[in-house]
Each structure stands twice: as structure tokens, then as C-alpha cells.
Amino acid sequence: MEAKAIAKYIRLSPQKARLVAANILGRPVEEAMNILKFTPKKSAKIIGKVLHSAVANAEQISGVDIDNLTVKQVIINPGPTHKRIMTRSMGRAFRIVKRTSHITVVVAEN
């Protein structure tokens, strides 16, 4: 059986989140949690929360052994961007793009 959790509109660049997501793909949940705990990135903490939520969702399904769960998929999609303007000298303005992400974690029994 599969269980998934989704976090949307997370104020985090998808490119930076994918670097951390690649480390836990295909690993057992316990090992993935340890990897995320000791990864010094903002995205590691957020992906860890989503993974924890996916495991909690798997507990709600009857007949699922939590110890045998593995990370089947970690999908990081871009969300909408927040566009801002930074004023510069001589009347100019530079555009700042603050990116967001939609994070999906799927866990399954092996």
C-alpha cells in the first residue's frame, strides 16, 4: 500500500529542494529520517516534516507495517512565484523573484 503527503506553497526554491530530495529517494523511512535530520539545509527540515506526515498517513491504513516503509517518490514541483522590486540608483528597479515549491512524498511497503 502507498501513502502520500503534500505540502504546497512552501517558500523554498525547487532547485535547492531537489538536491536534498535526491538523497532520500528509495531509502527506508528510518534511514531517510536520519539523513534529513543531519542535513544542514532548510529544505531538509521541511521535507522531513512532509515525510513524517506521509508515515502518519500510512499508519491510518490498516495492515501496513511501518517498519517496512520505503520512500517511493519525492516530487518537487515549482509553485507560483512572488515578484518583488528592489529599487536601485538613478531611478532604476531590479526584479526579485521569490520562488515557491509544492512537495509530495510517497511512501510504500517493500
UniProtKB/Swiss-Prot annotation:
CDD domains in UniProt: Ribosomal_L22
Q: Name one GO molecular function term.
A: rRNA binding
Write down the InterPro entries for this protein, in alphabetical order.
Answer: Ribosomal_uL22, Ribosomal_uL22_bac/chlpt-type, Ribosomal_uL22_bac/org-type, Ribosomal_uL22_CS, Ribosomal_uL22_sf
Q: Which GO terms describe its cellular component?
A: cytosolic large ribosomal subunit
Question: Which of UniProt's keywords are assigned here?
Answer: Ribonucleoprotein, Ribosomal protein, RNA-binding, rRNA-binding
- All disulfide bonds of the chain are none
PROSITE patterns in the record: RIBOSOMAL_L22
Q: What is one process in the GO biological process aspect for this record? A: translation
Q: What does this protein do?
A: This protein binds specifically to 23S rRNA; its binding is stimulated by other ribosomal proteins, e.g. L4, L17, and L20. It is important during the early stages of 50S assembly. It makes multiple contacts with different domains of the 23S rRNA in the assembled 50S subunit and ribosome. The globular domain of the protein is located near the polypeptide exit tunnel on the outside of the subunit, while an extended beta-hairpin is found that lines the wall of the exit tunnel in the center of the 70S ribosome.
Family the UniProt entry places it in: Belongs to the universal ribosomal protein uL22 family.
Describe its partners and assembly state. Part of the 50S ribosomal subunit.
Protein name (record): Large ribosomal subunit protein uL22
Task: Name the species this protein comes from.
Answer: Solidesulfovibrio magneticus (strain ATCC 700980 / DSM 13731 / RS-1) (Desulfovibrio magneticus)
What's the name of its gene? rplV
